[in-house]
Amino acid sequence: MPKIVILPHQDLCPDGAVLEANSGETILDAALRNGIEIEHACEKSCACTTCHCIVREGFDSLPESSEQEDDMLDKAWGLEPESRLSCQARVTDEDLVVEIPRYTINHAREH
């Protein structure tokens, strides 16, 4: 079973976490199943960027992003080359290290 290391996040996971994921499962579903409440305002339909994450290790093992995901990522706060929407990125058999950005578009508008 592949593992996902979630780097520490002040609000969602202050100490970080190591999760077991199922091959084919999205990063978001694995996180939610393990009690890490990543925001997903569009209910996992690839219509927002609130579940934006940065895959620090294992990025190349993920299936390619769709054009729709790429279009949404263009709107993400803090976009990096290793950015993915966690509701779309499906785990393979390789371990991942994932960073959840401090802010999302929703948070940026609230503050």
From Swiss-Prot:
Top-rank taxon, per record: Bacteria
Residues of the 2Fe-2S ferredoxin-type domain: 2-104
NCBIfam families reported for this sequence: fdx_isc
Keywords per UniProt: 2Fe-2S, Electron transport, Iron, Iron-sulfur, Metal-binding, Transport
Gene giving rise to this polypeptide: fdx
Name of protein: 2Fe-2S ferredoxin
Keyword set includes Phosphoprotein: no
Protein family according to the UniProt entry: Belongs to the adrenodoxin/putidaredoxin family.
Gene3D superfamilies: 3.10.20.30
Entry binding sites for [2Fe-2S] cluster: 42, 48, 51, 87
Cofactor info, note text: Binds 1 [2Fe-2S] cluster.
Molecular functions per Gene Ontology: 2 iron, 2 sulfur cluster binding; electron transfer activity; metal ion binding
Lineage, opening ranks: Bacteria, Pseudomonadati, Pseudomonadota, Gammaproteobacteria, Enterobacterales
Record bears the keyword Repressor: no
Record-linked InterPro entries: 2Fe-2S_ferredoxin-like_sf (IPR036010), 2Fe-2S_ferredoxin-type (IPR001041), Adrenodoxin-like (IPR001055), Adrenodoxin_Fe-S_BS (IPR018298), Beta-grasp_dom_sf (IPR012675), Fdx_isc (IPR011536)
Cellular compartments per GO CC: cytosol
Function, as annotated: Ferredoxin are iron-sulfur proteins that transfer electrons in a wide variety of metabolic reactions. Although the function of this ferredoxin is unknown it is probable that it has a role as a cellular electron transfer protein. Involved in the in vivo assembly of the Fe-S clusters in a wide variety of iron-sulfur proteins.
